[in-house]
Structure formats: C-alpha cells, structure tokens
Amino acid sequence: MSIITKMILNADAEVRYLTPGELDQINIFVKSSQRRLQLVEALTQSRATIVKQAGKDIFQRFPRLVAPGGNAYGENMTATCLRDMDYYLRLITYSVAAGDTTPIQEIGIVGVRQMYRSLGTPIDAVAESVRAMKNITTSMLSGEDASEVGTYFDYLITNLQ
C-alpha cells in the first residue's frame, strides 16, 4: 500500500482531512516518483545480467544445489531457480515503483516458506540468491539509489529466512 493510500485510510478512519504534515509527505513521495521509476527501468533493463550473475555466484557458493540430487541439478531445474530469482527481482521493482514493501509482502512472501519447505528447496539458498542479486544490483547504482533499492532486497531477505 503506497504512502498516499495509507495516509488517506488513516485520515478517513479518524474522520478527518489530511494534515499539513501528511500533505508534505505526499508531496515528497510524488516528487521522488520520477527517480523511483528510473530505478525500476534500470533494474528491468539489467534483469538478465543481474539474475545471470547472481545465479553464477549462488551456484559457486552452494555447489550442492547443482550437484546430482541438488535442487538445481540439470538444465530444467537450474532454469527454474533462475526463474524464481527473476520473480523476486520483479517484486523488488514493484516495491521500488510503489515506494513501499506491500508488493513484496502481498505478492511474494505469503506462503513462500511453506511452499519451498514442501518442495525441499533450501530456503537459505533462496535468501542467499536474493542477497547475491542485491549485491550485484547495488554495485550498479549510486549511493542514494543503491540504498533505496537495497532496503527492499533486505526486506525480502529477512522475510525469506
């Protein structure tokens, strides 16, 4: 839920108009929207590189994943892991666009730990693959942009563990 929606819902629940402070926060949010959209575009354009490099990193750090019997063993299973990584990167872009973690929480986190456990997928490796994408992504961005995007990766990592 965006900051604007939260403020409107809070004001409505309290049967009041938006306060000057809330209007200032909305103004800041609106002014930052162009930068957030540029970040989303940059991440979207770099997604193949981010996922490929992060996959290479995670498979080197966790060779058991691609070894016979591992969750990413074989071409199809490796592709499935990379697909999941791309999915999480897409959720990050949704949250950057929204300026809020709601897309990660509502689309990506609900039930994911249970699903991975039932499939025998090591959640630590999933969290580490997201961390690898974070490291690659933030190294491509400047300070403030890297910090903002990193916040959403950290939120996802924390909720996967």
UniProtKB/Swiss-Prot annotation:
Modification after translation (UniProt): Contains one covalently linked bilin chromophore.
Subcellular location: Cellular thylakoid membrane
Membrane topology (UniProt): Peripheral membrane protein
Organismal lineage: Bacteria, Bacillati, Cyanobacteriota, Cyanophyceae, Nostocales
Modified residues (N4-methylasparagine): 71
GO CC, alphabetical: phycobilisome; plasma membrane-derived thylakoid membrane
Domain of life assignment: Bacteria
InterPro entries per UniProt: Globin-like_sf (IPR009050), Phycobilisome_asu/bsu (IPR012128), Phycobilisome_asu/bsu_sf (IPR038719)
Protein's UniProt name: Allophycocyanin alpha chain 2
Annotated gene: apcA2
Protein purpose: Light-harvesting photosynthetic bile pigment-protein from the phycobiliprotein complex. Allophycocyanin has a maximum absorption at approximately 650 nanometers.
Keywords associated with the record: Antenna complex, Bile pigment, Chromophore, Electron transport, Membrane, Methylation, Photosynthesis, Phycobilisome, Thylakoid, Transport
UniProt keyword annotation of Thylakoid present: yes
GO BP terms: photosynthesis
Coiled coil region boundaries: none
Residues spanning the membrane: none
Family: Belongs to the phycobiliprotein family.
Binding site for (2R,3E)-phycocyanobilin: 81
